[in-house]
């Protein structure tokens, strides 16, 4: 479980001091809970996120434990280092909006015909209760030829999950190389 510290002071000086000590500034919020300003050690946080299997994961702040999902993050445009992360605390049975990653498998036929695989949409916006949240959308790209794509409407439908993106948006496709 990922452990963080609750920030007593939310001043700019305090944030700079925490960043200098190797902390990532974060905010935990959700329906029915009070916002919690906190900080996590940067490297263990990144390592934990890369190794986790599900979108929802537990964090411990002080004596409280929250089930959270990464809602938004900010990176330094020059160094590409994480600066800030917003964590949405989820409650069982309460619908929320999430962004579910798209993963692809297979090698498209179009790559042999001088095509390039283009991932147009890395995340799909959905609305559902946390217990119905899919970990990812898996797309088989093997049958795709040049100038073919998979749209949002072609994705696997999950029960009790409403896709918020327009159904005619391309998710992944093969385009012709110039």
UniProtKB/Swiss-Prot annotation:
This is one of the proteins that binds to the 5S RNA in the ribosome where it forms part of the central protuberance. CDD domains: Ribosomal_L25_TL5_CTC. One of its GO terms (cellular component) is cytosolic large ribosomal subunit. The keyword Magnesium does not apply. It comes from the Bacteria. InterPro entries: Rbsml_bL25/Gln-tRNA_synth_N, Ribosomal_bL25/Gln-tRNA_synth, Ribosomal_bL25_b-dom, Ribosomal_bL25_C, Ribosomal_bL25_long, Ribosomal_L25_dom, Ribosomal_uL5_bac-type. Part of the 50S ribosomal subunit; part of the 5S rRNA/L5/L18/L25 subcomplex. Contacts the 5S rRNA. Binds to the 5S rRNA independently of L5 and L18. This is Large ribosomal subunit protein bL25.
């Amino acid at each position: 479980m990922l452990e963080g510290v609750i920030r007593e002071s939310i001043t700019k000086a305090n944030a700079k001091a925490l960043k200098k000590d190797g902390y990532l500034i974060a905010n935990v919020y959700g329906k029915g809970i009070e916002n919690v300003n906190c900080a996590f050690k940067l490297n263990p946080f990144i390592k934990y996120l890369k190794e986790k299997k599900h979108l929802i994961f537990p964090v411990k702040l002080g004596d409280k434990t929250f089930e959270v999902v990464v809602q938004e993050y900010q990176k330094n445009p020059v160094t590409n280092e994480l600066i800030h992360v917003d964590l949405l605390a989820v409650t069982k049975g309460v619908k929320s909006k999430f962004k579910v990653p798209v993963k692809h498998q297979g090698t498209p036929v179009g790559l042999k015909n001088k095509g390039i695989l283009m991932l147009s949409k890395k995340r799909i916006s959905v609305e559902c209760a946390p217990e119905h949240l899919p970990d990812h959308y898996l797309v088989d790209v093997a049958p795709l030829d040049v100038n073919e794509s998979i749209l949002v409407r072609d994705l696997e439908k999950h029960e009790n999950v409403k896709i918020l993106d327009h159904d005619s948006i391309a998710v992944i496709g093969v385009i012709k190389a110039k």
